[in-house]
Amino acid sequence: MERQNQSCVVEFILLGFSNYPELQGQLFVAFLVIYLVTLIGNAIIIVIVSLDQSLHVPMYLFLLNLSVVDLSFSAVIMPEMLVVLSTEKTTISFGGCFAQMYFILLFGGAECFLLGAMAYDRFAAICHPLNYQMIMNKGVFMKLIIFSWALGFMLGTVQTSWVSSFPFCGLNEINHISCETPAVLELACADTFLFEIYAFTGTFLIILVPFLLILLSYIRVLFAILKMPSTTGRQKAFSTCAAHLTSVTLFYGTASMTYLQPKSGYSPETKKVMSLSYSLLTPLLNLLIYSLRNSEMKRALMKLWRRRVVLHTI
């Protein structure tokens, strides 16, 4: 079937923001800056956690995995989108398009469960501090990490294989910023009803269930925070929880709106904005909220910087 598809459509055209030629220059600069900050920032987090033995505990190892996911997620989408913004019309091969779709689903699926696992880790640390070592032991941590990545691989493999089996024999213009499943599915010359049922069920399980678990975890955390004797401590904890919830709500909210109904009635421009929310803004917010606001991460960064300065002076 795939050979037949490729004989009809050998490449796709990504339209991106071609309807707004006067804004493409500004969008290119803005997206490039955000992409570079996300790329460099997450790379630094990966290096810091990998080199500092004191950070080899579940909380920071979760952050390391989140940085790997966010860096990879951005790298899959952003370069192609920047090319789209810098040219009038850009093409992507049939195989290249589905390769991009696969990795978007892989890293997106992994992040969905990983954020839930991180919320559970914080819940265990704050609400059950005496039993935390037993609750979040090495075995539990490894199972959560392995399951997160396995979920991403499974989602990417099943969904990409299914969509690529559809015939594509008509228009080859994808009115989107990347080869995401809903945008590509609109070009399929076949009945996709069964796939849409699968997409709805899969999205509910992979996106909405972890999100609900995160909300429940943070509700328990907030009750624990209210019992804190220190007003300053409560304010700091509330600020951190609010920042975390803002990031996860943006990610899960826009992703569910996109994937619950692959052929939804949203306008193409609305779909592009929603895609930017979880592919461009969320990785940046995760970097700022989960890592750079963390005091231990700042300490490790300064330690690494001082070591670098000392080595240069020798």
Swiss-Prot record:
Q: Which GO terms describe its cellular component?
A: plasma membrane
Q: Does the keyword Disulfide bond apply?
A: yes
- Going by the UniProt annotation, this protein carries glycans at N5
Could you tell me what this protein does?
A: Odorant receptor.
Instruction: Please verify whether the record's keywords include Transmembrane helix.
Output: yes
- Gene encoding the protein: OR10A6
Q: Name one GO molecular function term.
A: G protein-coupled receptor activity
Which organism does this record belong to?
Answer: Homo sapiens (Human)
Return the protein name. Answer: Olfactory receptor 10A6
User: Which PANTHER family does the UniProt entry name for this protein?
Assistant: OLFACTORY RECEPTOR (PTHR26453)
